[in-house]
Structures are given as C-alpha cells and as structure tokens.
Amino acid sequence: MPTPRLWSWNLSPFAGKVRVAFAEKNVAIELVEIDPRQRPKRLRELNPTNRVPVLELDDRTAVRESTAICEWLEDTHPGTPLWPADPDARATARGLLRWVDDELTTNFFLSMRKEAFGLEDEDHPELVTILRSRLQQRWSTAEQLLSRTDGPWLIAGEAPTLADLAAAPLAVRLPAWKPDLVPDAEAFPQVDAWLSALRERPSSAEVDRRGAPAADR
C-alpha cells in the first residue's frame, strides 16, 4: 500500500486530531498543507465540500472527515488501538468523541478567530463572549465526566482513546493562544490533569506539524 496522503491545514483541530492519531499508531503519512484562502482544485476533486482533512489513498479513493479517517486507520492498523476492546466501553468512547468534537473543539476553535483567521475580536464582541462562556461551561461537564474514571482519561484505562486524543489540539494550543481560557486547576483538577497528560504525549508534537504546501505539488 502506498503511503497515504493527508490533506491538512495546520490550524484545523480536526486535521490535528487525525495527525495525532496517525502518530499514536506510528503510521507514516505524506502531509499536504493547504491555504484555506486559496484551496487547490485537487482538494475539491477529493472532497466536494472543499474541506480538510481528507485522506487520499490512491487516484480514485479518498476518505473524508476526521472521524471517518481515524476509523479507517483503526481498521487497517489495529496495533495501538484507538478504541477500547470492550463493546460497551467502545460505544461510550464514541459518544464522548462526538461530545469533544462538538462541544469542546468547535467552541474552542471558533473562539480563536484572531489566531486562526486573523479576525479581530472587536468585530463581533458578543459572539466572542458567548463562545468563551460556552467553553467555560464545558469544563464543568468535562470535570464530571473525568471524575468517573481513575484518570487521566475519559475511559478508565492506561491509554487514551480517540475521544481523548481529539482534544490534543485544544490542550496544546489553548495555553499559547488564550491563556485566560485555560481551566482553573483548583476548580477543575481532573480537566487540568487530562490536558496536561495529552500535552505530555509524544504525539502532541503533531499538532503543530505542517506539510509540504499544496501549491508546490
């Protein structure tokens, strides 16, 4: 099988989730970096929605959307599993992944208007206030979820699942981009330990990895 080609954008937390998952399994990828302001024609050919991440397997096959790509990775490279072996725990982890993607990652990324898109917070101050409030509320929910396990992961066990790894881009970038939104360690000790554990994993280096520019292809 040729090396899969991952079409990515460095700042996309969903592309970052995929890069981290490949690193956890030690599976090589060819990384192609797009500029979201000048998306190459090839990207739309691979994904009619014109979004990343997209995993290009060959001239005719592409896997779209971050979770679908990670499921393909799990099916084709079962070593270092991304999901628990137990069916009940696996179903729970899949539900938690959806929550992390929809409630944590999305609110975090939309709060990063200036850092990700060069947009000033002053343009829509009410939107920024709402997004920040939502993120703070999500820390409370995350604390409750994490308190059900022995820590530091969302599912009891020694290794993280994809539900945890999906939060790696947030764990890495939040202290650098928006330190005022970092959860208070005293108020949310479980969340603090969770984010710290994600930052300490070698795979977290993939969050800042950039590929070869798509324009150079």
Description of each model-found segment:
Residues 1-129, 148-150, 154:
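GST-like domain detector, emphasizing the conserved glutathione-binding G-site
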Residues 9, 162, 211:
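Short, solvent-exposed turn/loop segments enriched in Gly/Ser/Thr/Pro and often Arg
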Residues 100-197:
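GST-like fold's C-terminal all-alpha helical module
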Residues 185, 189-217:
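Long hydrophobic alpha-helical segments typical of transmembrane helices together
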